[in-house]
Amino acid sequence: MKSFVVVALLVAVAAAVPLTPDGDAQILKYENDNIGVEGFQYGYETSNGIQHQESGQLNNVGTENEGIEVRGQFSYVGPDGVTYSVTYTAGQEGFKPVGAHIPVA
């Protein structure tokens, strides 16, 4: 019985160990430029291969169609070791991601 408990405990500990060091990732680069109400730009890069850049611009200022148009790109390394990249826009027509791994409608 004691050996069963010890084996079960060892299995539980082994299963709890993270497979990737993402919890220890460090921020290598961070930029943030708040242009005020008319726009923004920011980006970051982490030690585990994540990158993200985004900018936004206010369009049609002072009209009923006023809105922000966002453009960006992010990438990350998946559990399979492949780097996935997505470029996107978001605005009046919704969120539009584009990436080699994303199916096209």
From Swiss-Prot:
It comes from the Eukaryota. The keyword Glycoprotein does not apply. Residues 1-16 form the signal peptide. GO terms for cellular component: chitin-based extracellular matrix. Keywords: Cuticle, Signal. GO terms for molecular function: structural constituent of chitin-based larval cuticle. This is Flexible cuticle protein 12. It comes from Hyalophora cecropia (Cecropia moth).
